[in-house]
């Protein structure tokens, strides 16, 4: 076997076993060995002696993507422009799965920076299908997910309550990756039709006061990274990009993150991206929502910068609860909780919905403080407005099936 053929067989083996190779990097205790392993991957798929003519259907690693990976392997963070180019090449289908996995793994090993988030978000925003709403000053409650606590879908319930309180909402979201239920899962379980065109979503927002921006339908370029994300089964930078890439360009955001460090990173990125106003919250350094146990860390984003504060259940005027009071096994259970709360059920599930809906209303400048936002959220539930809006959303979307 000639040298070129031998190297091509090495490449095919790496491509066929890319998942195993990349995942094996995480078992290493040495950052040096991680870098060495990834260098081997890069050499095998893009080494100077490799003849791409042996496999003409395979796109050659682009200069920007290769440079980005090599910079990360040396422990350096990427500029906004370089990250923008690298993610753009991935989302334009100009990279292989092994190359994508190499970039995502290198980012994860070193930890994503603010500039990297900003550059990636800009590339993703440019390729998103926009929602042509007439309504302005929209709110989004999309969080990062991935807290693995298996609570019911609090952020989606909070979006419905905020909309029932009069705040227009463009809820961005997807199906579950690591939790029991994602926003798409629970809305589908409630009976909402997710398969709407961008014009229908805009009409839903303008008419009902809330619409769901189903990420796979509006971020078509993500299809190139999706198989790699699924095979890796770990958190990557794409988990952080959902809250930064609302297709309706929401002016206000309530963003949940499962770690305080991630919350601060997102807050700084939102500020750099020019977000009008956002609250980025992390409950007790484990929940990607406002929590009613421990302390919720809140990063307030405005044009002036980012400020940090903390909330507790007692400061919100609500009873504390345990995570066990909020856990579900599937989307059907999550939907049942929302229906029960909207029908008047009291207890921890209602309280945490009130807390998060109040935070959403505060983020949208509908209240002066979290304490004054609490009764607004509670009234939207207690008067039956949340239940009626939920049924209207279901009916409206089904009529456009």
Predicted features and spans:
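Active-site cofactor/substrate anionic-group-binding motifs, chiefly glycine-
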Residues: 111-170
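Glycine-rich anion-binding loops and their surrounding alpha/beta cores
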Residues: 63-67, 71, 77-78, 126-129, ...
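N-terminal glycine-rich anion-binding loops that anchor highly charged ligand groups
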Residues: 62-64, 70-116, 126-133, 352-353
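Aromatic (phenylalanine/tyrosine) cluster motif
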Residues: 8-11, 26, 43, 50
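Active-site-proximal loop->helix
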Residues: 176-192
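Intrinsically disordered, low-complexity serine/threonine-rich segments
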Residues: 3, 13, 27-34
